[in-house]
Amino acid sequence: MTISSPSYHSIKNVAYLIMGFIIIFILFDIDNLLSDKVDTRIFRIYWIIFIVALSLSLYWYYQATKNIQSFGTKEITSPVKAVIWWFVPVYFFWKPYIITQQIWKASNPKTILATGTEWKNSPNSKIIKVWWILAVVSFFGPIVQGGMTWMDLIPEVNDEVDDIITNPFSIISYIGATLFMLIIRQISQWQALKAVENIS
């Protein structure tokens, strides 16, 4: 059955903007890791870029969820909750992962929606699984390391040793960010294709 998609809005440009800001953010972060001094102006720009990238990403999630609803997808998280769950303590450790899987499966052009729930039969994306594992590790790693230092479980270290400990988590976060860029680009492209199919 052909489904009209009057509420569909392309998110490809938003995805490309997010990717651009993430790349700039990573470059700033690498420069910060390699630098001996912290430039206050650079630090401010660094956080402005982060906030802009975060805001765009939240908008992307809102619109991506709204788009799959316009395709006829049923029994999915609402667009508003797709944003809110990122900020709810404890739940933010798995809800965004589930939402991303929902968007991925429902956006896939191979998922033909007749009753609206066929997306549930699609397999979970492995790239999303890896991305989320890396995201959680990069989030928890520095916290655990800082906590162990605070409790004197490991000695307070100098900057050189601290870099050795924290740099692996930075690298993990870069890999996770790269996977995130691939995920949102793929979903954005799929949704554009699906929108054309639904109105043809």
Residue spans for each PLM region:
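Transmembrane alpha-helical segments of multipass membrane enzymes and assembly factors
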Residues: Q63-F71
